[in-house]
Amino acid sequence: MHSDTNEHQSHVPAKKVLIVDDSRVIRMWLRTVLASDRRLEVVGEASDAVEARDYIRANPADVITLDIEMPGMSGLEFLTRLMRARPMPVVMLSSLTSKGSDAAVQALSRGAIDCILKPTDGYDLDLSRDICERVYQAACTRPASLKRGEATEKPADAPMMQRASALGQPCRRGSLILIGASTGGVSALEAVLPKLDPDGAPVVIVQHMPGNFLESFSQRLDRQLPQNVKLAEEGVPLRRGDVILAPGIGKHTEVVRRMDGWQCRFVANDPAALHCPSVDTLFLSAVSEAKKVSVAILTGLGKDGAQGMLKLAEAGATTFGQDEETSVVYGMPRVAFGLGAVQHQLPIHKIGEALRESKNASARTARRTTKVPLQ
């Protein structure tokens, strides 16, 4: 007897969702949105952290949606306690204020799977589908198997002292590191970037998240790392020790090689593109200089970056993919691995060292092949 996909899905138990938000309006809105997806079932609501704690103790849930800003115990504090006592998938709800963006990035670093923006202009069908998919995918994951707190902030003077040697130095050999990440990427990047050479090849990253979040994330990384972390600027030469994040400005970020080294440039968004900025767009822009490039694709939902990594690998780049065990969502790296684009599949705690060694190996090769003038 024939059965279609929807009929098959109806036999799969729905993922149980607990909504935690002090706003009754937001709780009602979110319940309505999630009710449109048969894969999800809202099993409870809580207006504050205490109610949420009591509910979790007595009732099973596969995923929690958690407001960041609540009276009493904040969502961020509750998340921190939850991850210590009973780790489970959490999707944060945040406003687009500066305070909300900073807290959202902290939440993603502390173990939240994803962060959804609260609506500002009414109900939207595409937004509804996106929220349902992200909550469902979060419910299918487990908290990343990373040690929380590894990326603690360094003393304020440590990064400045280490930056002095790299400041203003162009990357003459042309080496470049490219990284793409999505869901789970904040904690993954905080595991990778500290292990890179602080005076080494520049790094350009596409991390899927709203623009305000990217600004907060770049500032957070800049406080944590000896590297110089900032959002990409068009036409500015990339220097040794730079870590550049593609901004969320409605345009894609590409890299281009000039006489004085690598630069970033912005290109118009393709309406057909699912993500902006796009990992694929970044990766494809470096194919002509692939032999100078090391590239990594980290945890994330979907397939953005897989085709671009394949083209880079075919053109001579060194490629790395995060393994399934340490990925929050084994989507982007899975597709890239399936295409044969990933040359080295590694747990997240080994990718930073592998990227660093790949650039050191490139530098040694360059020195061996450089002709030395006769004396």
Curated annotation (Swiss-Prot):
Residues 170-362 form the CheB-type methylesterase domain. GO terms for cellular component: cytoplasm. It is found in: Cytoplasm. Keywords: Chemotaxis, Cytoplasm, Hydrolase, Phosphoprotein. Phosphorylated by CheA. Phosphorylation of the N-terminal regulatory domain activates the methylesterase activity. InterPro entries: CheB-like (IPR008248), CheB_C (IPR035909), CheY-like_superfamily (IPR011006), Sig_transdc_resp-reg_Me-estase (IPR000673), Sig_transdc_resp-reg_receiver (IPR001789). The modification 4-aspartylphosphate is found at D67. The keyword Hydrolase applies. The active site is at S182, H208, D304. It catalyses: [protein]-L-glutamate 5-O-methyl ester + H2O = L-glutamyl-[protein] + methanol + H(+); L-glutaminyl-[protein] + H2O = L-glutamyl-[protein] + NH4(+). One of its GO terms (biological process) is chemotaxis. Coiled coil: none annotated. GO terms for molecular function: phosphorelay response regulator activity; protein-glutamate methylesterase activity; protein-glutamine glutaminase activity. Its EC number is 3.1.1.61, 3.5.1.44. Residues 16-133 form the Response regulatory domain. Involved in chemotaxis. Part of a chemotaxis signal transduction system that modulates chemotaxis in response to various stimuli. Catalyzes the demethylation of specific methylglutamate residues introduced into the chemoreceptors (methyl-accepting chemotaxis proteins or MCP) by CheR. Also mediates the irreversible deamidation of specific glutamine residues to glutamic acid. Contains a C-terminal catalytic domain, and an N-terminal region which modulates catalytic activity. Belongs to the CheB family. This is Protein-glutamate methylesterase/protein-glutamine glutaminase.
